From Swiss-Prot:
Region spans: Disordered: 803-829
Pfam families in the record: MutS_I, MutS_II, MutS_III, MutS_IV, MutS_V
Entry's family note: Belongs to the DNA mismatch repair MutS family.
Leader peptide range in chain numbering: none
Protein name: DNA mismatch repair protein MutS
Any GO MF annotation of the entry: mismatched DNA binding
Source species: Shewanella pealeana (strain ATCC 700345 / ANG-SQ1)
Amino acid sequence: MTAIDPQSLEKHTPMMRQYLTLKAQHPDMLLFYRMGDFYELFYEDAKKASELLGISLTARGKSGGDPIPMAGLPYHAVEGYLAKLVQLRVSVAICEQVGDPATSKGPVERKVVRIVTPGTLTDEALLQERQDNLLAALYQGKTGYGYATLDVASGRFVVTELANTEALEAELQRTNPAELLYSEDFSQMSLIAGMNGTRRRPEWEFDYDTCQRMLLNQFGTKDLKGFGIEDARLSLQAAGCLMQYVKDTQRTALPHINSIVRFNQSDSIVLDAATRRNLELTVNLQGGRENTLASVLDNTVTPMGSRMLQRWIHQPLRDHDIIRARQASIAELMMTGDFETLSEDLKALGDVERITARIALRNARPRDFARLRQALTLLPQLQQTLSAASAPHLKYLSQVIGVFPEEVDLLSRAVVDNPPMLIRDGGVIREGYNEELDQWRKLSEGATDYLHELEAREKEQTGISTLKVGYNRVHGYYIEVSRRESDLVPLSYQRRQTLKNTERYIIPELKEHEEKVLSSQGRALALEKQLWEQLFDLILPKLHELQDFAQASAELDVLCNFAERAESLNYHCPELSSISGIHIEAGRHPVVEQVSQSPFIANPVTLNAQRKMLIVTGPNMGGKSTYMRQVALITLMAHIGCYVPAEQAVIGPVDRIFTRIGASDDLASGRSTFMVEMTETANILHNATPNSLVLMDEIGRGTSTYDGLSLAWSAAEYLAKQLQAMTLFATHYFELTQLPEQLSNVENVHLDAVEHGDSIVFMHAVQEGAASRSYGLQVAALAGVPNCVISAAKHKLHQLESRDHDVQQNTEQQGTQQNMSFVPSAPSPAVEALQKLNPDELTPRQALDYLYNLKKLAL
């Protein structure tokens, strides 16, 4: 059954009518329907859950004349299944029994009490500790896009306006939302086609007036001018829809969402989607998190510090004052060595940011309060270390972190040292906190002593050695006697239960005592839950200060981490200049140097007004791509305030970093490798400025030699002459090394290699001037191309070089000059085939077949 007609509900059983009514209210979610000790799913939900969770798909009789597909899972194991569904970006509505079965006529009353969606998680068991979990909303208008993100687990609410699809694509990649809301009129579906967790919302949810009222009500303000978003109409519409969705799913007040920040792309260095991917900032090209910039830089000691560091990496700043404040803090932490002491203290803070959010949502658990108490207790010690700080930013962070003596006192008096996971069974509130609770507990505990006395007395009076007093939830208190001594039981004993080897009885005195015990236990538990709820009310007035403390502690963690990384990895403080250019001495790739088995060869780079472009040549595997990437990464690191892997770095204003490195087919959009390459190139040529850093690697490979060379030459010329962007342009078209002869701001550099017999040694050192050759055949041999293919290729290369030499001599004798001086001659089809050959992708068999094809082409 794929859909339920409301008109046919009467055909179903009362229970299924209840289920179908609830399911109709949550059509795009799996409905976990509580049945005793299980959550059950029916119809399409059951089939989907069976497939996703690997649970059995069965049937539960018939309803409406059709078999009902059914799947179930134990209620006590639900968190594990929820975690798996959340990872798959599937939302779940959890339906519980809220009525009393004893008084219910028909099905027990049920209602959805919790909604779990990928973007609204707050439970630590469902969240990735060191990654933000964002809910996003997207609205398309005539002038661009409005985009809003909210981290429900922290309360961080950010909006931005984007002018075009390229900017939107970059922002989607930067934020990587767990769940994305978009309007039914959204037209650029190709941008989100591959994303999980997308939710199509009706257009009316993005109504401007409705969204504005929603935000004003949430923040308790008369207008939005104080947040700087009053003129950001599109992002305001996205934010309003997002806020309504959160209210619908959380079903509680959201006091921790108390502000909204507008992100302006002009405040940070713009990184497009290709650049974030190619530089492997937080995710590598295979989709993992190892061997990324974040994996090297992140030695933070708190989860909230780690999340902040990743946000910084994806959002390098352009404001030199903020960067210098961070640098000064790092310098002082290194000079005093305080980063080690502070890191030890910070480590014990845990994830205060998310704990505070759970308190605001009133779904914190007892251990959250215990962890908060531990964190707040450590603050005087942290402040003592910071008290001697002279760096202005460290002083500011110390002031924001503050101390919370009243909250420490409250939590110390109220919560036991090692509380249970849940409040459900009590045992959370400390003795002495509430006199009435202590009295009820003593009554309950005194009852235990009474039971021991009763057991001893009855044993003595009856002479039954096996007699003992027990308790279970079904039958309450009872007297248990072995079967062999049951004939000694007095007539006043009333049999309650017969087991295999024992008999169980009750007596009026024990029944009366049971009522007293259960009454005292019940009253104690009810009062404890009431006191527990009051704890939230007592902590929440300090919510904003606690949020600020968490934010400042996270930043202090990142700065201490930067100090540790600088000291451990031999990083140096970069100098920020107001003059355009990049000068790096002995720069190193921060990731490659950590994973390389051999010592990393440091290299310099200089880009300035007189030297805007470097044409980078050299052999494959010689290090061209590594060299270019390290320049970009050092530049990025400098703009997050981090020290850099270089002996010296002077970096001027940078507005964007572009990379056109490597490409693959975009099958989802129907674009070939060459089309992807040209699209990325077009984006660079349209948007680069004199303050942009551009990395271009092997432009023009995916087409004919003439086409590729012409495109590469023209793109390089446009970048250097018209745009004057700071550019590293790697190529195997040696004709491009003639470009410096025509443009004064272009120079050649190369990565050297040395031949030794038939082998080659890569020096990985950058030298001035152009490379003499590309060593393609030697690299092919290293890759394992069969010797017969290498020999044939050498012979063919000699023939081609001889022919080109003859053509050149004839041209010189005739005194003519080709219009395109950088094209020596028209190559044969065999040459073009060799140009397109990628030896790394050939098996021995394919290489042999290729050789035969080359022979045919040469004839």
